């Protein structure tokens, strides 16, 4: 199944990178979403990170942030700050742009209505969560009512612990919850090869080769693995593309080929 095969299937857009601190780009994104919704009844869901806001806040607090294998290490003493940056500032910045565009926005975290199941990571990253599909009831009701859910990557486990979830992994879990399509928007056009050229199609074998060679690493490795997981569990292609070409966003949402297509 591909994105063009079922245009009534919910579409999850994962937003990341410098987009969240670029007001002009956000306005262009929501303008494109508004244009798309004027001609399509397809439900949309936004899932976001907000590393730029986390970095800015931690720097003001004189806290040094570290990453391990592309994932942010989150000391338990810092999770309150990170929750504020992601579920607070980042989420409300996106909600503000959505409201300006005329959308009926609802700000959520991964814990609301059990839309995702979050458990603490065992990778020695601190207050970091692993994310799996949850209960679709709340999201289905919101989408049926014409709302645009905007979901931060903050979760809460069964013990009530706040956890920071990688936004790519969070978006994958939300797709699994809704049986939705997924487009990951970031600063780059898609997955790039060793010569920094766009790779139009990617599968698990090719990804393993590029990861072993060090071509795909850090945050892109996390993103690619999340996309591969989604492609396998949903049995459909996932797209990685850039938000930097706003005039192509509507075409991308309509299923036209942009960026890198990831299949299992």
Curated annotation (Swiss-Prot):
Primary enzyme class:
transferase
Q: Kindly state which keywords UniProt assigns to this record, in alphabetical order.
A: Amino-acid biosynthesis, Arginine biosynthesis, ATP-binding, Cytoplasm, Kinase, Nucleotide-binding, Transferase
Site feature (Transition state stabilizer) residues: 14, 223
User: Which GO cellular component does the record give, naming just one?
Assistant: cytoplasm
UniProt cross-references to InterPro entries, sorted A to Z = AceGlu_kinase-like_sf, AcgluKinase_fam, ArgB, Asp/Glu/Uridylate_kinase, NAGK-NC
HAMAP family the record matches: ArgB
Q: What does this protein do?
A: Catalyzes the ATP-dependent phosphorylation of N-acetyl-L-glutamate.
Q: What is this protein called?
A: Acetylglutamate kinase
Q: What is the native source organism of this protein?
A: Moritella profunda
The opening ranks of the lineage are: Bacteria, Pseudomonadati, Pseudomonadota, Gammaproteobacteria, Alteromonadales
